[in-house]
Each structure stands twice: as C-alpha cells, then as structure tokens.
Amino acid sequence: MRVNSNKKIHKMKRDPYKTLLRTAGILAIVVVVGVGVFYLCSLAVTSDYVSTRNRIENENAEAELEFNAMMNELRAEQSTALTPNTGVVSSADLPSWEKTLNDTLWRIEDESNAGLENTSTITLDRASLINGGLLLVNPWHSLPSDFSEEGLVSIGTASNFQIQVQDNSVRVFQPAYDALSEALTAAKDEAGLEYYIVMEGYRSVAQQEELFNAEMEKLSSRYSGNALIEETKKNVNYPGNSDYHTGMSFRMDVYQRDNAALNNLKFQAESEQGAWLTEHCWRFGIIFRFPTADFPKGWEDKSYKTGVSAQLNLYRYVGKAHSAAMRVLNLCLEEYIEFLIDHPHICVYEDGALKYEIVRIKIADDAQSVQLPVPNPASSYQASLDNMGGVVMAYTY
C-alpha cells in the first residue's frame, strides 16, 4: 500500500505475471524435491530388492547343499547292515550303476529298502496314468481297453508345419510332441541338423488291423492257419499289441525337397540326423524303441525282449527321468520295467547331485484312482501306469 499527500491509504495492485512466476518457481522446487525423494527411495528399494534376492539365492543354494548332504547321510545309513550273529554294523554293498554321458557322470543307486521322506499325497485317476508315458504295449501286453485317443495332437498343426510330417494325420500325445520339438530344436542349434520328417505316429487298433490283414494276404500263398498268423506277426504286430497304439511313439526319417542325395540316405545307418538323434534323444525324455543287432550301429540286440526284430526308426517318449536311467543301465523299455519290479526305489545322480528319484508302486488292476506320494522337495513329478500292475512315479529335484 502507499500513502498519498492527502494521507489516504491506497492498496497497491499485485502484478499477476510476477505472482505466476513465483508460484511456478515454488511448484518447480516442490517437483525437484519430490523427484529427488522418489529417486532416493527407489535406490533404497532397489538396493533392498537386490540384497533380498541375493540372500534368498544364497539360502536356496545352502538349502540344496544341506538337502544333498542329508541324502548322502541317508544313503550312508541305509548302506549299513547288522552282521548276523555278531550284531556288528558293517557296510552293505547296495547295487549301484554308473555311466558317463556327455562328460557328465550319472549314477543310479538302489534305495529299495528306504521309504520316501517328507511327502504329501495326490490322487490321480486311471485315465491320466494311462497316458503318463511309461505304458508298455507289446506282443505280451495289450493296450488297455479303457485307453482313449482324447488329447492326441497333430504334429504338423501344433508346430505350424515347422516339423515336417508325412501328412497331417501324424499324431502323438502332447508330452511326446513337446519332447520331439525340444530334440529337433537342439539338433538344429547344437549341430546345425535339419530336414527331419515324422513319417508316422499314433496308430489306432483299426489301422493296425488293416495292416495286419494286408500282410496276411501277402503271405497267404505260403502259409495257412496258425502258421500264417505267426509269420505275419514277425513283420506286423497283432492289433492291440503295437507300441504305436500308445501315442507316444514316432517313426523318423530325413527329407528335403529336390535333394535326392539326402532323401536316399538310410536314416539310422547313413544320415547325420539319425546318428545325432539316437545319441542325444535320452536328454529329452526319448528312447530308441526297438534296438536289434547292430541297429543302431554298435547297439545290443533287444529283439528277444521287445518281440520286434524289424529295423524300425521308431522313437518313444518315456520322460527324462526314465530315459536317463535306461541309458545308464542300457535297457530297453521291457527290461527297464522288469528292473523296476526288482528295484522299486532308485535314485539317479548327476555329477553327485540328486536329479531324479523313481518309485514303482503296485496297484490293483481295477483301481480307477490312486493315492500317490510326492516328496515335498521335488520340483515336479511324472506318474504312469506301466501295464504290468504298477504305477511308476518319477520325481525331479
């Protein structure tokens, strides 16, 4: 305000521009201070997050070491026994098997005298167990009557035809497709190998019957009666007794358009693709289904167990735990299930660390659902009927 010569007081008008600048300045200071505070808080939160994450990772690593140490102690305790008559504790030679695969030492130990520790219980129905991956179907074990095709996927459609197929009718169950896709991706990434083609997958009993009857017709001029049936079985499995029925098997070959040199190669004996897949498929839960004498090259004849003497480029999904164990033990599927009957609890170690634990549990033939144990430390499990009166549980750690 100001006082004039008449001593009257007059209020001075404020400059609105200066007021606006002053307000803007104050707001700018508030914003800068706010940003600074937010930045400092963000740094504190980030630092706390990193610290917490590192602490949790360290705790997890320590917990894993403690768990493996505990398992080693349990193995040590279970490998001792009282000597008869003396009562002295002595070391017992529990069976174990070792093999080096891809520069990694794999060891299998028999834990059949020990139970699972710290378990919870799950309930699974028979339908899911049938498609668990380990179902044995061969000349002596028929496809279960309650088997369902539900869940089969077209390999061509599922892969957007990135995986070559004979036609769009080539189907398998999802676990088999996932394993095949992973294996073929690795073949390309690791070895630069492409041009695989899936020639055949799931076969229905009706399709198998057509093939069987066609083979009988070809042989009918030379055989008759039971002799005709038995001779036909040597080339084509009896309907209901083919591994193709499981939806977990697929027959492979190589193919590239306008590349006759590649297309004429014998998949197993001559192509790099066949050699790589046979050597590495176990890493992805896949086995070579029907080894015969020197087919694949250097492999032992298993036809006396499988009942199949034909040279088939057939691969079968069984799951990573089982394919690793079968590779270490050098067993075909028939031998492996017999092995699990004799050794119903085994542990599989990768470079000394527990990787898989496998347990076979007897069940009633007419059981429609089964309560099964799952160790709480396990990160995942696979459950499957074996078609020989048992459920096989495989736990991954």
Predicted regions and their residues:
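Extracytoplasmic cell-surface/polysaccharide-interacting catalytic and binding patches
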Residues: 2, 9, 13-26, 30-201, ...
